[in-house]
Swiss-Prot record:
It comes from Arabidopsis thaliana. It is found in: Cell membrane. The chain crosses the membrane at residues 30-50, 60-80, 113-133, 143-162, 165-185, 211-230, 242-262, 285-305, 336-356, 362-382, 401-421, 425-445. It is a multi-pass membrane protein. Probable cell membrane polyamine/proton symporter involved in the polyamine uptake in cells. Gene3D superfamilies: Amino acid/polyamine transporter I (1.20.1740.10). InterPro entries: AA/rel_permease1, RMV1-like. Keywords: Cell membrane, Membrane, Symport, Transmembrane, Transmembrane helix, Transport. It holds the Pfam family AA_permease_2. Belongs to the amino acid-polyamine-organocation (APC) superfamily. Polyamine:cation symporter (PHS) (TC 2.A.3.12) family. The keyword Transport applies. This is Probable polyamine transporter At3g13620. PANTHER family: CATIONIC AMINO ACID TRANSPORTER (PTHR45826:SF8), POLYAMINE TRANSPORTER PUT1 (PTHR45826).
């Protein structure tokens, strides 16, 4: 399709940053190393949470999963994120991509599905944190002490996010290094005890494929979430591809080394491989001191995961407000810290309400909604190559459209498995949320037409925007 033939909606999306909005321009704060660790915490945060893959399918399939899955999922998703984030470096992220490809309805659906999956994912981290803490403090296993701990941790960590992305970025560096250090010690101490034949075990005959695939997916996805922070990055065209490359390698190594070490050194009943088992394995390998160290690392990792995911969700809401998909007040920033406090508050409150769900249902629901969003993302990526071939892309995936189709079809097959193996409660939760996302689009249009809320209006001409020039946002009602 020729660029001049691209259809235009009534409020075509631009790529906006703080500089192109009505806000006072501020210096971008994310440089390479903090961005690498934010991506790392968007995706992984360490080997915490990989244990159920062994419980579901045995050591061999767990190892193969973490070896192969990055090639069929993580790398393609990271490549797409690198190309589109550098072509459209704004806080709208994947919302911009979907809208530019297919229009406002698809852009709105993409934003809603990814936001809902994001806040559900945020809800899982206080739960994971308390799951490790209750091994040190059994009183947190259930009842009101556990609920109070989840509530308090959510409030405190949300306030940390409010203090600024620069603080969150550098905190992620420290949290990442400290939380990984006990695993390096454990892996080194496990070497004399490793028996390689244990790696070939298939475990029990009955496999829990739902748990297996959801564990792999949950531990190795969300690479594109960092796209909602693109407007806050120094030189995103250069920084994003390099940061994603480093993060992919770093994340895969962080999963595989402890997995090889523990499955090779420890022989236990497969049912014991549940969330938190790495801490028990550390005690078997080196003693209680290492178990405590890993549990402390798990808490720190959960903090990093929470901060990174909450940042993405909050800045996504700000980006959608900048682009006219949400009322302007969603993009309000703090006068003290220049952070999108409304986005942080809404994301934190929603995640708090969801954090009392069953942990497995939390993961499965986040994966299901994310899967629906990824189908839209793959389609948007390919269609933008066809629709806007002359668009300036500082980083371009080195494939033509047929190759891109194949690259996207392989992970799409895995997405189908996620949908097929979902449970009834997950279908129910995600069905209601998807219907709600459709209704939200029409409700927002009603608000815009009746001027109940104030929206940004964006005037964009794709014919004059193929070289990466980003039109301004008119700061008035649409």
């Amino acid at each position: 399709m020729a660029i001049s033939e691209a259809s235009k909606s009534s409020h075509e999306l631009p790529v906006t940053t703080a500089e192109s909005s009505g806000k006072k321009a501020t210096a971008k704060k994310l440089t390479l190393i903090p961005l690498v660790f934010l991506i790392y915490f968007e995706v992984a945060g360490g080997p915490f949470g990989e244990e159920p893959a062994v419980q579901a399918a045995g050591p061999l399939l767990a190892i193969l999963g973490f070896l192969i899955f990055p090639f069929i999922w993580s790398i393609p998703e990271a490549l797409i994120t690198a190309e589109l984030s550098t072509a459209f470096p704004g806080n709208g992220g994947f919302v911009i991509w979907a809208h530019r490809a297919f229009g406002s309805f698809v852009g709105s659906m993409m934003g809603s599905l990814k936001f809902l999956s994001g806040v559900i994912n945020v809800a899982s981290f206080p739960v994971l944190c308390v799951t490790y803490l209750d091994k040190l403090f059994p009183v947190l296993e259930s009842g009101w002490p556990r609920n109070v701990c989840i509530f308090a941790s959510t409030v405190v960590l949300s306030f940390l996010n409010y203090t600024g992305l620069a603080i969150v970025g550098y905190a992620a560096v420290v949290l990442g290094l400290v939380s990984l250090s006990p695993f390096l010690v454990m892996s080194a101490m496990a070497i004399p005890k490793i028996k390689p034949h244990r790696w070939g075990s298939l475990g029990t005959k009955k496999k829990d494929w739902n748990l297996y695939f959801n564990t792999l997916f949950w531990n190795l996805n969300f690479w594109d979430n960092v796209s909602t922070l693109a407007g806050e990055v120094d030189e995103p065209q250069k920084t994003f591809p390099l940061a994603l490359l480093i993060a992919v390698i770093f994340t895969c190594v962080a999963y595989l080394i402890p997995l090889f070490a523990v499955t090779g050194a420890v022989s236990v009943d497969q049912s014991r491989w549940e969330n938190g088992f790495h801490a028990e394995a550390a005690e078997m390998i080196a003693g209680k001191w290492l178990k405590i160290w890993i549990e402390i690392g798990a808490v720190l990792s959960s903090i990093g995961l929470f901060e990174a995911q909450l940042s993405s969700s909050a800045y996504q809401l700000e980006g959608m407000a900048e682009l006219g998909f949400l009322p302007k007040f969603f993009g309000v920033r703090s006068k003290w810290f220049n952070t999108p406090w409304v986005g942080i508050l809404i994301s934190a409150l929603m995640s708090l309400g969801l954090s009392y769900m069953n942990f497995t249902d939390i993961i499965s629901s986040a994966n299901f909604l994310y899967t629906l969003g990824m189908f839209l993302e793959f389609a948007s990526f390919i269609w933008l190559r066809r629709k806007l071939p002359q668009l300036k892309r500082p980083y371009r995936v080195p494939l033509k459209i047929p190759g891109l189709v194949v690259m996207c079809l392989i992970p799409s097959a895995f997405l189908v498995l996620i949908l097929v193996f979902a449970t009834k409660i997950v279908y129910l939760i995600c069905g209601v949320m998807t219907i709600g996302a459709i209704g939200w689009y029409f409700l927002i249009n009603y608000f815009r037409k009746t001027k109940i809320f104030e929206f940004n209006e964006v005037i964009d001409d794709l014919d004059n925007n193929v070289n990466g020039e980003h039109p301004k946002v008119d700061d008035h009602n649409s």
